[in-house]
Regions:
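Solvent-exposed residues in well-ordered beta-strands and their adjoining turns
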Residues: 22-26, 65-69, 84-86, 97, ...
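Beta-strand/loop substructures that line and gate deep hydrophobic ligand-binding cavities in soluble
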Residues: 95-144, 148
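Hydrophobic/aromatic beta-strand elements that line small-molecule binding cavities or substrate pockets
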Residues: 18-21, 50-52, 77-85, 105-112
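Glycine-rich portal/gate segments that line the openings of hydrophobic small-molecule binding cavities
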Residues: 10, 51-98, 151-160
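Short amphipathic alpha-helical segments
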Residues: 26-32, 75, 138-145, 149
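A general secondary-structure signal for short beta-strands and their flanking turns/coil
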Residues: 14-16, 57-59, 76, 103, ...
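Hydrophobic ligand-binding cavity/cleft-lining segments
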Residues: 1-59
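Hydrophobic pocket/interface hotspot
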Residues: 29-34, 40, 83, 121-123, ...
Length: 161
């Protein structure tokens, strides 16, 4: 599976990571998987829980807990995210309300690739760790996780279509 990735070091110590996957999964199945917030932890690796706690017309709040084994230690982090859905543009933006990161924001985007019957699935994340979580130490892990997340979403989308 070919995944294009970029990683950028930002001036404030944050990292911006982006990953893109081309898939034959349909827009509707990808959208349905990405917006099934209460079940994301069932197929996204290292996501222990995901729970929608508020929703109105365009915004929702989701609490998520992720877990990692890093250098033999189990590490978990919690985030409360504000999400904004634009289905007509295939876009889900997210911003940190509060949590174990100083910054955790970005978007998921589904884009159709002209004349191919395929879609591009993009995950773009800007993240800044806390004092006890130096981002430089975990950036390789984050890059791998972004790829794993894309593959997991694609696999689930093909199952539901």
């Amino acid at each position: 599976k070919t995944i294009e990735q970029t990683m950028e070091k930002l001036t404030d110590g944050a990292r911006r990571l982006a990953a893109q996957l081309t898939t034959t999964a349909s827009f509707d199945s990808l959208w349905s998987v990405l917006t099934d917030y209460d079940r994301l932890n069932l197929f996204i690796p290292n996501l222990l829980s995901s729970k929608k706690i508020f929703r109105n017309e365009t915004n929702l709040h989701v609490r998520q807990v992720g877990s990692q084994d890093f250098l033999g230690l189990k590490f978990s982090a919690e985030v409360l995210l504000d999400l904004y859905e634009e289905k007509e543009n295939g876009l889900i933006k997210f911003n940190l309300i509060k949590g174990d990161f100083r910054k955790f924001e970005g978007y998921w985007k589904i884009q159709s690739i002209s004349n191919t019957g395929k879609n591009s699935l993009i995950y773009d994340l800007t993240v800044k760790g806390c004092q006890w979580m130096p981002i430089g130490m975990i950036e390789k892990r984050l890059k791998r996780d972004l790829s794993d997340n894309l593959i997991a979403v694609e696999r689930q989308a093909k199952l539901v279509s």
